[in-house]
Amino acid sequence: MALTVVKTSALSGNINLTSQVTGTLPAGNGGTGATSFSPGKILQVTNGDYSTQHNNSTDDLADIGVSAAITPSATSSKIFITADTQYSMAAVGSQTFMGGVNIFADKGGAGYNKISGGGSFGEYYALGFTSQATGVERRVNGRWTACMLWSPSTTSACTFKLYSHNNATNGLSCTYDSITTHINLMEVGA
């Protein structure tokens, strides 16, 4: 903190902070003291929560049930996305079971498209295990989390959802045991 000096001639009567004080004054009333802000300021925050267990027993994409929407204030804005869900994967028999969760977005009503990851096999099936036993259930439980920065280049409403998928007709449950699933959205100014 810089040293603040008050002139001795100003010690009686009122002190004029613009002419009788030198140095840096602390910000009053909890302010930051900043006179301008650089790009990257958070402009708005929205979120969506969901607490009903979703079970996917097909090899198709399935909407988990959670959604959140945000309308960017400028085409140059970015959206910082965090998402998480409790999952449980189960299989009976000798097999390799793989599954995953991905973030999908709908820009201005144009339909949902996957925006998370590059689509590689390892990224798409981020959860998995191999079961060598037959007739015995194998189960893996955990918390899937993701965060990413997305550039929608629009001022139209953007809605986000999570989709689950797996490679077989086994069970992949999300929002497992009704533990809340979240999507949090923050508009970051350019």
Regions found by a protein language model. Give the residues of each.
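Glycine-rich, low-complexity segments
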Residues: 1-53, 190
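Terminal beta-strand-rich extracellular "head" domains
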Residues: 48-49, 54-55, 60, 71-157, ...
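Extended, low-complexity regulatory regions
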Residues: 66-68
